[in-house]
């Protein structure tokens, strides 16, 4: 009995103590468990490292604490004394002894209380959410009670068990309206509490209990709204990602189209061939027998041995001799023409 009370106090403490099975991790138990794992691995023909759990250990042996616990068969377990479950489900308010002030979410297993209204006779106060068109004329319940109007009905069932009521959007619109009414009721009941406390501070406990019920219902309705909020947020994220992908695709296609036009423009540029050069013309560079320039605007090619320089691509850098300056000038004219086409396309 004393051990049970000690265990319960340890689980309920703010900082729980380490589990008591840490005492089972002794050198002798570790050695015995290693031998059992080795024997189990040799019997089943698997490596020892792959053995996670050895079944059929004696229940009264300390060796069962040296291996991880078995998976919960029913999907439930206890953690620090609190029950845990693999199924994420919202517990109904009725299971916690809290009165529900509005209709349950269609399809849920919770049931609303009769008339979904809570009225106190002592202070003539109410925790029923007020409607949008309710205009309270007095904050003091002893002078004028708050009017009570029914909440919007939940979806009704059609013959055959099918829901003839609202769709998912209408359902969550109803929750939105219910949240709005709860918030107005919270403000009204808070003002009533201030009025009661100003007249008789000892009589404010009932109104404080009403406020607690309203807050718990408000929080519960918010939790019922979470799945819808998660779906809407996921839809928004997917839509943003789709828009981003479409924008990137359009930008890539635009760049590809510009590159195609640039290549077409470069293909239309005419570059004079060497055969078109007037080798024997009369120009400024000399007389008979010398390489001069005629009407052609292209320099006369000079044998490579006649001048020095380094060939880079389709030109020579640092050349000297006859025609070197004109050849350099013509090269940069061709380069400028090509870059002009690029600038015009990407401007």
From Swiss-Prot:
GO molecular function, one term: transcription coregulator activity
DNA damage found in the keyword field: no
Region (Disordered): 97-172, 302-326
Alphabetized UniProt keyword annotations: Activator, Nucleus, Transcription, Transcription regulation
Coarse class of the protein's main subcellular location: nucleus
GO biological process, one term: regulation of transcription by RNA polymerase II
Places the protein is found: Nucleus
UniProt feature, compositional bias: Low complexity: 108-171, 302-312
Short name of one Pfam family: Med7
GO annotations of cellular component type: core mediator complex; mediator complex
Family designation: Belongs to the Mediator complex subunit 7 family.
Role this protein plays: Component of the Mediator complex, a coactivator involved in the regulated transcription of nearly all RNA polymerase II-dependent genes. Mediator functions as a bridge to convey information from gene-specific regulatory proteins to the basal RNA polymerase II transcription machinery. Mediator is recruited to promoters by direct interactions with regulatory proteins and serves as a scaffold for the assembly of a functional preinitiation complex with RNA polymerase II and the general transcription factors.
Subunit structure: Component of the Mediator complex.
PANTHER family attached to this UniProt entry: MEDIATOR OF RNA POLYMERASE II TRANSCRIPTION SUBUNIT 7
Protein name: Mediator of RNA polymerase II transcription subunit 7
Organism annotation: Neurospora crassa (strain ATCC 24698 / 74-OR23-1A / CBS 708.71 / DSM 1257 / FGSC 987)
Source taxonomy: Eukaryota, Fungi, Dikarya, Ascomycota, Pezizomycotina
